[in-house]
UniProtKB/Swiss-Prot annotation:
<dbReference type="GO" id="GO:0005737">
    <property type="term" value="C:cytoplasm"/>
</dbReference>
<keyword id="KW-0067">ATP-binding</keyword>
<dbReference type="GO" id="GO:0000105">
    <property type="term" value="P:L-histidine biosynthetic process"/>
</dbReference>
<dbReference type="InterPro" id="IPR024893">
    <property type="entry name" value="ATP_PRibTrfase_HisG_short"/>
</dbReference>
<keyword id="KW-0368">Histidine biosynthesis</keyword>
<comment type="function">
    <text>Catalyzes the condensation of ATP and 5-phosphoribose 1-diphosphate to form N'-(5'-phosphoribosyl)-ATP (PR-ATP). Has a crucial role in the pathway because the rate of histidine biosynthesis seems to be controlled primarily by regulation of HisG enzymatic activity.</text>
</comment>
<dbReference type="InterPro" id="IPR013820">
    <property type="entry name" value="ATP_PRibTrfase_cat"/>
</dbReference>
<dbReference type="InterPro" id="IPR018198">
    <property type="entry name" value="ATP_PRibTrfase_CS"/>
</dbReference>
<comment type="pathway">
    <text>Amino-acid biosynthesis; L-histidine biosynthesis; L-histidine from 5-phospho-alpha-D-ribose 1-diphosphate: step 1/9.</text>
</comment>
<keyword id="KW-0808">Transferase</keyword>
<dbReference type="Pfam" id="PF01634">
    <property type="entry name" value="HisG"/>
</dbReference>
<dbReference type="InterPro" id="IPR001348">
    <property type="entry name" value="ATP_PRibTrfase_HisG"/>
</dbReference>
<dbReference type="GO" id="GO:0005524">
    <property type="term" value="F:ATP binding"/>
</dbReference>
<dbReference type="GO" id="GO:0003879">
    <property type="term" value="F:ATP phosphoribosyltransferase activity"/>
</dbReference>
<comment type="subunit">
    <text>Heteromultimer composed of HisG and HisZ subunits.</text>
</comment>
<protein>
    <recommendedName>
        <fullName>ATP phosphoribosyltransferase</fullName>
        <ecNumber>2.4.2.17</ecNumber>
    </recommendedName>
</protein>
<keyword id="KW-0963">Cytoplasm</keyword>
């Protein structure tokens, strides 16, 4: 049995056509179903529906053999028990710093609000900046407006939400897309099966971008 961990939303919607190219079609619509384990058209493949931030945990610990996760989630997670064999080139966006439009660069210690705490600490440590990182779970744009933080680090798509709240994107930390991740033990134990799936998905990704 191959178990693939996916999260609902944009990543799921973009991943399903790629899985379909490998003959893997869920038995019911994961967006509408309340089930968290969904059988597929292949008797030896099932889907697990989990939170986006939990995908790497399920895969690293072997509860899922494979998963699809955004590079932002993988950068924050930083686990060791995963292979990342394929960039699926879906759910593209940017991980950026942002601050109030026209605001001067703060002197001294920087206060940064983000849900990407590990990414923020690494990014500013590499620059030699002293920072206080404040963990938030949502509505990052509010933090600079009410004096909670000087800057935020967040995923940016169009930047419209930032600008609507008086903020502007500033420094690019990473270009983000969704990646296929594989449990290291599963790759050893089911190598031929998983490698065949990786190759089929790679072909589907390339075919999608040829059009």
């Amino acid at each position: 049995m191959l178990t693939i961990a996916l999260s609902k939303g944009r990543i799921l919607d973009d991943t399903l056509p790629l899985l379909a190219a490998a003959g893997i079609v869920p038995s019911e619509n994961p967006d509408k179903s309340r089930k968290l384990i969904i059988p597929t058209s292949l008797p030896d493949v099932r889907l697990l529906i989990v939170r986006a931030t939990d995908v790497p945990t399920y895969v690293e610990h072997g509860a899922a053999d494979l998963g699809v996760a955004g590079k932002d989630v993988l950068m924050e997670y930083g686990g060791q028990g995963l292979y990342e064999p394929l960039d699926l080139r879906i759910a593209n966006c940017k991980l950026m710093t942002a601050g109030a439009i026209g605001a001067a660069e703060p002197k001294g210690r920087l206060r940064v609000a983000t849900k990407f705490v590990n990414v923020a600490k690494r990014y500013y440590a590499e620059q030699g900046r002293q920072v206080d990182v404040i963990k938030l779970y949502g509505s990052m744009e509010l933090a600079p407006l009410v004096g909670l933080a000087d800057k935020i680090i967040d995923v940016v798509d169009t930047g419209n939400t930032l600008r609507a709240n008086g903020l502007e994107p500033q420094e690019l930390i990473a270009t983000i897309s969704s990646r296929l991740v594989v449990n290291k033990a599963s790759m050893k134990m089911q190598h031929a099966r998983i490698q065949a799936l990786i190759d089929t998905l790679r072909d589907a990704v390339e075919a999608r971008h040829r059009h």
